[in-house]
Amino acid sequence: MEQQDQSMKEGRLTLVLALATLIAAFGSSFQYGYNVAAVNSPALLMQQFYNETYYGRTGEFMEDFPLTLLWSVTVSMFPFGGFIGSLLVGPLVNKFGRKGALLFNNIFSIVPAILMGCSRVAKSFELIIISRLLVGICAGVSSNVVPMYLGELAPKNLRGALGVVPQLFITVGILVAQIFGLRNLLANVDGWPILLGLTGVPAALQLVLLPFFPESPRYLLIQKKDEAAAKKALQTLRGWDSVDREVAEIRQEDEAEKAAGFISVLKLFRMRSLRWQLLSIIVLMGGQQLSGVNAIYYYADQIYLSAGVPKEHVQFVTAGTGAVNVVMTFCAVFVVELLGRRLLLLLGFSICLVACCVLTAALALQDTVSWMPYISIVCVISYVIGHALGPSPIPALLITEIFLQSSRPSAFMVGGSVHWLSNFTVGLIFPFIQEGLGPYSFIVFAVICLLTTIYIFLIVPETKAKTFIEINQIFTKMNKVSEVYPEKEELKELPPVTLEQ
């Protein structure tokens, strides 16, 4: 009875843990979502600014091709910056810690926010292009460090819920940008620089507030070898003094990893003991982006117009779709610990698979069957719901769970790189796929959803309510490494963990 009471106290959501989660997610993840959508509504106004600026310098307007190319560079700078940011994750979290990396990362938000806010006054579209690269770097770092930080702060029974919070704030950021981007708010000639510059507000708040919250206890004990600081951080996060059980579990993880030392990206690819973990994050991160989520949003406006939504009202319907995304991700926060990660992934990718197949049929028949455009709208909403439940929030959470401390930064670097390269690839090739395949474009994404679902069903284990050691014991058996150079493996066969009741 006493042990159960102790477990309940250790696993509760305290005010400090809740505030640390909200500040980290709002200050970092929110910006990612905001900058994804911030340039969509004012795109034509910004291109007009590019042209007027060019005219002011040369006395002539740009032709269509160079203007389109310049705008494409502006948009693509964000995922390119995200890729660069992913490569910085390992060095930053190992040098500054998880919290320190987030604080340092605010440079890549506040500086470009000022530059973008001043770009129209300065008559420089180059400032916007450079700033898009910088906010991309910010997003690349935050999309990896925030899940890592929260996953290491949370007790095991809350790790899933708190791990979904970053994705929730990404969707909130998208929705806020869509609302602020309405034409009667900031998507106008005078307002669009303010719309772009607002991304610095969450960063400034995080810079002021996050220093008052603890660093990751795992980072403090395993990497800094400061058990006293780790214990103090745990006591602050858990709201009581008796944290010896958790300290012992972290110490056990530290002992298990001493033979491995720091694991670089190159070493990560060479280690047989991590092959299924590594392959799983590559498949999940690739499947997340290559399943067509960006293409759905790209195609949504056209689908709404074909269904008879007036052109001037499409912006409101698009914001409504963003609201659905927020609501379903909010639901995922509460059901991830009830249903588990594996089931949400299977359910989410399956819904996306069916939505892509039905959408293909609806698009092919919309010219001959009058009510098919309405089916297309249902498919778009269904896809958004499915992706919000599993494919969007769960992969980053799983990277935290299936890797131990020594390999986790490098794993996030790999997962983040796959995420951003896949994002960039879809944005680059989807217009060509659409031109070549027309209404059958989404068959490509349906196939990717199917293959990812099969992989999850066959390979990915459930990690709900398990310690990091217990999860890695599952993969140790899958990788069959207990007798292959055990002194060089990240985790040897360990006796069952008895610290958690």
From Swiss-Prot:
| Sites where a glycan is attached | N51
Q: Its family?
A: Belongs to the major facilitator superfamily. Sugar transporter (TC 2.A.1.1) family. Glucose transporter subfamily.
Which ranges of this chain reside in the Cytoplasmic compartment per its record? 1-18, 92-98, 150-161, 214-277, 335-342, 395-412, 461-501
Biological process annotations from GO:
cellular response to fructose stimulus; D-glucose import; dehydroascorbic acid transport
Transport in keyword set? yes
Q: What is the protein's membrane topology class?
A: Multi-pass membrane protein
Ordered alphabetically, the record's keywords are: Acetylation, Cell membrane, Glycoprotein, Membrane, Sugar transport, Transmembrane, Transmembrane helix, Transport
The chemistry this enzyme catalyses reads: D-fructose(out) = D-fructose(in)
What does this protein's UniProt record list under function? Functions as a fructose transporter that has only low activity with other monosaccharides. Can mediate the uptake of deoxyglucose, but with low efficiency. Essential for fructose uptake in the small intestine. Plays a role in the regulation of salt uptake and blood pressure in response to dietary fructose. Required for the development of high blood pressure in response to high dietary fructose intake.
As recorded in Swiss-Prot or TrEMBL, the protein's gene is named SLC2A5
Q: Which residues carry this modification: N-acetylmethionine?
A: M1
Q: Give the residue spans that cross the bilayer.
A: 19-39, 69-91, 99-119, 127-149, 162-182, 193-213, 278-298, 314-334, 343-363, 372-394, 413-433, 440-460
Which domain of life does this protein belong to? Eukaryota
Q: What is this protein called?
A: Solute carrier family 2, facilitated glucose transporter member 5
